């Protein structure tokens, strides 16, 4: 197996819920990090990036669910670079880095950009399906924290 190396690291800014970053989209945060990494490493051409794997615990709403893909396009990477978003809640970013390492170790790629990005303030409100067409029993949930659409069986087992 190949040995993997982390050649550079940068992190997104850390904010507070409802704070200074509240109006910043998640894909824009991801693009900022990708663009900054590419600018700091001019010896790595954009075309050398074989994949972008980003973790995100709440990929729903305005960011189109695939934050990695949207972020890499916003950062100016070629449209031929694929993007994969990993959702393992709090361990999403670490899982993305581990997945990238595995892909390189197995020889499927040489250069992968991996990490994580999140903005919990931007988590959307979500509405449940109704029990029948045009029903009036929809429920609304804040998707920022906690369970959203709780499966009653899981609630009975662990709730």
Where are these regions (language model features)?
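Acyl-thioester C-C bond-transforming condensing/cleaving domain
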Residues: 1-2, 16-46, 61-65, 72-159
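A residue-level signal for beta-strand positions that form part of recognition/binding surfaces
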Residues: 3-4, 51
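Short polar catalytic/cofactor-binding loops
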Residues: 10-14
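Short glycine-rich phosphate-binding loop at a beta-alpha junction
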Residues: 48-55
